[in-house]
Amino acid sequence: MSAAERSPLFVPPADLLLPTPEQRAIQTSTAPTLLIEARAGAAKTTTLALRLAEAWSRGALAADCLVLTYTDAAGEAFRQALAAGGVPPAAVQDFRITTFDAFAASVLLHLEGGMRVPDRTAAEALRSVVWQAVQQISDQQDERWPDALEYPSQGDAGFVAEFLDNMAWLKGTLTLQRHAPEGRLTPDDAAEMGQRYMTLRLLQAYERLRAGGHPDHPVFRGPADATYDLARLLLQQREDGIDISPEGWPARLRVLLVDEMHDMNEAMYTVLLHLLGGRGTFFTGVGDADQVIHAAAGADAGFMKGRIEQDTRRAPQVLPLKASFRFGAALARPASQFIGKPLETGGGLVTQVSVTPYADEDTCCDLVLAAVRAGRKKGAGKAAGLAILLRHEHQSIAIENALIQGGIAYRALGLESYLLRPEVLMVRGLLAIVSRDFASLSGRDTLLRLVQAFMLFCGTRFDEDPERPEAIQDQLMSDALRDFAGNAENLPMFLANHVLRKADPAAARRLRAAMAVAGEADGPQRFTRFLEALDMPWFIAQALVRPDRRAGAVRNLTGLRALASHYPDTHTFFGHLNETAVRQKGMKRSGAITLATAASVKGLEFHEVLMPYLEQGEFPYERGSPTDEANLFYVAVTRARQALRLYVHDRRPSEFVGRAGLL
């Protein structure tokens, strides 16, 4: 019996889900290795969930199933798809659904004796290691090609950001492992890999520092390092002729599923290959080549195009999933024109697509707020299905204030509320200390973030504990956070004893000047003078690594200054910030709309999608990869089911809107 004729054992309730012929073929396929080539809106995650539910109905135990995703959000979307298809909640919880990196970390935890390795995910936490690595190279006396080394100026944040970006790609692609020179790395080797010699030497030095002197576990792990470390271990085993699964590996794996396979890189693929080595493992992967948004980390849709057949004895069956049941023809047409490929629609869906021009940010915000209010009038259920998608985090300030002032509950996805961003928290903290008004900072989480903001921007370090000479700075920092994050009344003492006393003189001078202004008689210009005295861009330039993050932080403060101009004095404005923070905490989350970055909504869908600030240079971002920016726009617009509303700058419209044929 063919896959198309085979009757399914798992039949979701008709009122929940009625699978299409394409979905049924995938659900019931008997192929041990199945690859699904999908299009946006074709219910990739739902279909993969059907595949898992079918295996479960045929006797596969949850403990013998593994679902791997790129992000936590994708994993949560998969759980929701299982539940939406009628899989009992208890069964949904039993399935192991996790990210590649979390899976790798769990395996490594067993290998490393149960000792957790600290994570350092922020670029700012990795900067000092990069400079230590530069120093190591500089100190090396036996360097054979010193003229090939290009040393940066000390403190060059752009150099650090560029190296971190290069490192993410080099690790994701396993370039040094796959093209390892027989002897010592040479400039010619680097040229053959398409890299600068300095970059590769720096990566080697950085990795030695990360490994530390312990034979069993590294000092820390950065973004995706767990996957990278496990992949290297597996490659070494293969090279040594060892075919033994590491401790912590799934003992019996019957069903293996990979969602968003188009974002797979070489390190993830190496882990996948080892998982595919088990006998009797049924594998299904699904992806869409037009939704690759992690190419900077080595993501490549090519892993769905022959690599498995080339590297294993498996002969994958390839099935299509092209008909979109998320949106109608009015959205399918521009989306199809944008990617230059046909998009099929089914189910008689109707999707409204509108393009509205705006002259400035305030006007755009007003238009978005009006659309949100109109959506809320349709009921709480409709409001909960409404999403505002932003290209940049800093674009949320005016929208957040409008939502909060309008009593409209929202949940943030892929971004922090502007009130909790470090540069804004530092401003709030200084004003709170001067005014002795700690009402809005009383929450432990907020206090913790506030202390971390001072530490980030002021370079605060803690005195070594003579009773614990082995305690590293991370441990001392953790202890201090517990002490100072318990009570807002401790903030003045923290500022005096740990920030001002140990700060760089230039930083301390700016902090004291700002506090002096904050203590003067109030008036309409005091907040502006406070910001000028503080000179927050100076702190941002010293502390933050990535250019886009620095630019975003400055934009956050510009937005804060613009917001303050609507209030008669600093006291009133600070009161507004405090009231906003309190109201935000107290908002009921039922019927909340979603405020998200476009990059955070892959795998999700919404009844209505609003995309503001579509201005050339903003989206597409002028510093972004053209391909990644285009894929990100495609991902964002195809999240909509019933309505897509685009707000386009009237003088500098996004080229993407025109490319989709909507201008």
Features from the language model and the residues they span:
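Hydrophobic residues in beta-strands of the RecA-like P-loop NTPase core, especially within AAA+ ATPase
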Residues: 258-264, 287, 611
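P-loop NTPase Walker
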Residues: 1-116, 333-336, 638
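Accessory N-terminal region flanking or inserted into the helicase ATPase core
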Residues: 2-47, 64-66, 146-257, 266-271, ...
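Conserved RecA-like helicase ATPase core segment
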Residues: 10, 266-354
